[in-house]
Regions:
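Long, charged/polar, soluble alpha-helical segments
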Residues: 207-209, 216-585, 599
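Bacterial N-terminal signal peptides that target proteins for export
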Residues: 1-6, 584-585
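Sec-dependent N-terminal signal peptides
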Residues: 5-14, 592-595
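Short, Lys/Arg-rich N-terminal segment immediately upstream of the first membrane anchor
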Residues: 1, 12, 577-581
Length: 604
């Protein structure tokens, strides 16, 4: 009875919410769509599949996600609905904060979990937004990743058998899971569990059950099978690295090349691994610059300068009498650099935010440098203190570098829009990381360092809303990459898929008159990485940044700001000279007397 009352109130809220919709909003179906879900559950006879029904309704609103389940389900199903709403909006290029999403799921008995329903829920959300019908007889299992991929799940044979009881004709599974292993557990007479593994060919099992089994890799593939509508976007022949982008980055790369090499030449007398590594990094960066990978080159020049500055400061520390005062002076130096970068950023933003990516990149780097400076006070090891201070100093300088990459857009994004979105994206990042953590619980420690979330919270508190948005996206992309690579033997196909999605998103932004410099630079950095996780994470991040930037500019206002501000990178004197141990005159006289006495004795 209570559930019926709640459902009545729930549906009444939908009606009221729709009554207040804007006149120019999209007309959405009152009843939404209903889609079958498959899950697995534990019974007295062991693991078995279960068929559920989900009703998905989308109304004009403010970005909220509501879920009504009976009985209460685990956090992973709730997380699946949040991801479904986010991905559906992303795929269709709509503003998620203009809609509210309602998921009504009836569960006959407790299920093991709900992540495998994510793909189907996303399909239903896309169908509800477009008023499309769901084909009868189609059932799907698979998680949904924030970058639109269908992820692997367990218990597929049991789910396939359950689907067969509901007149299913087509059963969709994640790519790479046509053949799966099932662990059977039987108890011996002595009460000992006996484990055996069976390999199941789902195509063969499907034939026995009269069902076609088919793989899908992306949500676009799944939507086509469920609705007949093809929303896949073809990769264009347009390059990611346009002449405008290369011309923008080249001067910065050349300036950093000169600065880092001058630093090395003035410090080469210090013979340690940091200096040797700095030279190697410069050589690698030169090669990248010659191949017009200017942003990737600047990243290596940056690392080189951090190494050299660390060596310089360590060398000077070793030769200082008052070492405590020297560390205090270094802290003051870094504080001054951070303040200079903050002042440049404030001046840059004084006329409004016209290039949100450049501002976001600068804000993120200033906040990171400030955070490191805070943490240094808790370190006891002097070498760690010096190396972290050197990194913080150079990281703060990169904010100034980014401001030189400004591209006038002729538009200003209102601060209240950025403030509102920063809180929303932080909430999304927290939800995604919690959701994905629930999927791999027991397989290791936390995916995302709590410090990453804390940093975003500090950015919002400080008014660095653009930086908070892009740092939240980085958390989301890192979290989603973890699940994408789970149990994947050869990640190359998924990496290529992520790269292609990023390429499409970047060129879509350009088609709207936006130059997504940050997104392209992230993509470029991903190209030089070799670690599969890091590479895929960068491509996923690049795509999210490009799409989010496009969304933010949809709220921009016209501006007369078309002239690039006069911003230059300050030239910093990094030269040091070898320090020789000073001897007192008396000491030198004693040495001379000893030499004379030795000579006289030899003559005798």
């Amino acid at each position: 009875m209570k559930n019926k009352i709640f459902l009545a109130i729930f549906l009444l809220m939908l009606t009221i919410g729709n009554a207040h919709a804007l006149d120019n909003s999209k007309v959405l179906s009152e009843n939404g769509v209903t889609i079958p879900l498959v899950a697995d559950r534990i019974t007295d006879n062991g693991e078995e599949g279960a068929i559920l029904n989900a009703q998905v309704i989308v109304k004009n609103g403010t970005g909220h996600v509501f879920i009504d389940t009976s009985p209460y389900t685990q956090v992973d199903l709730q997380g699946s609905t949040r991801i479904a709403a986010m991905v559906a909006s992303d795929v269709l290029g709509i503003d998620q904060k203009s809609y509210d999403f309602y998921y009504i799921i009836e569960v006959d008995s407790p299920i093991i979990g709900g992540p495998s329903a994510g793909g189907a829920l996303t399909v239903a959300t896309i169908a509800a937004i477009n008023n499309w019908q769901i084909k009868p007889g189609v059932v799907m299992t698979g998680t949904i990743d924030p970058d639109e991929a269908i992820g692997p799940v367990g218990g597929i044979p049991f789910k396939l058998e359950a689907a067969a009881t509901e007149n299913t004709t087509l059963f969709l599974v994640p790519q790479g899971q046509l053949i799966v292993n099932i662990t059977n557990v039987t108890m011996t007479r002595r009460g000992i569990a006996d484990h055996s593994v069976n390999t199941v060919d789902l195509n063969e099992l499907g034939k026995k059950l009269g069902i076609t089994v088919k793989e899908v890799s992306t949500i676009q593939d799944a939507v086509l099978e469920f609705t007949g509508h093809d929303i896949r976007k073809q990769s264009t022949n347009k390059t990611v690295f346009t002449a405008n982008y290369l011309n923008l980055l080249e001067p910065l790369a050349l300036q950093l090349a000169n600065e880092s090499k001058n630093m090395y030449n003035n410090t080469a007398f210090i013979d340690n691994d940091l200096i040797k590594n700095a030279l190697d990094l410069q050589n690698q960066a030169d090669g990248l610059a010659n191949n017009k990978k200017y942003y990737a080159a600047t990243s290596l020049y940056f690392q080189s300068m951090v190494n050299i500055l660390t060596s310089q400061w360590e060398y000077q520390y070793d030769h200082e009498r008052d070492k405590d005062q020297y560390i205090t002076n270094l802290i003051n130096t870094v504080e001054k650099q951070i303040q200079n970068s903050e002042n440049d950023l404030d001046k840059f933003k004084s006329n409004g935010i016209s290039d949100v990516e450049v501002v976001g990149a600068a804000e993120s780097r200033i906040m990171e440098a400030s955070n490191i400076l805070e943490d240094v006070k808790n370190l006891n090891n002097t070498k760690d203190v010096i190396s972290r201070l050197a990194f913080a100093n150079e990281r703060a300088r990169t904010a100034q570098w980014w401001l030189t990459l400004f591209v006038p857009s002729g538009k200003i994004i209102p601060e209240d829009v950025l403030k509102d979105r920063s809180g929303w994206y932080l909430s999304q990042a927290q939800s995604v990381s919690t959701y994905i953590q629930s999927l791999i619980s027991g397989n290791g420690g936390p995916i995302i360092d709590k410090g990453d979330i804390t940093l975003v919270q500090k950015e919002i508190k400080r008014g660095y809303y653009s930086g908070a948005i892009f740092d939240s996206l980085r958390i989301i992309s890192s979290s989603s990459t973890v699940i994408k690579l789970l149990e994947v033997q050869d990640p190359s196909a998924r990496i290529n898929q992520s790269a292609k999605a990023a390429e499409i998103a970047i060129n879509e932004a350009r088609s709207e008159g936006i130059e997504p410099t940050l997104a392209v630079s992230i993509y470029e950095h991903g190209e030089i990485l070799t670690n599969p996780f890091a590479k895929m994470s960068q491509y996923s991040y690049a795509k999210m940044v490009a799409k989010t930037t496009e969304s933010l500019y949809s709220h921009a206002l016209p501006s007369n700001e078309t002239i690039k501000p006069d911003i230059t990178i300050p030239i910093v004197n990094r030269s040091i000279t070898p320090i020789t141990d000073k001897k007192s005159p008396a000491f030198e006289a004693i040495i001379l007397i000893i030499v004379i006495l030795v000579i006289r004795r030899l003559k005798n």
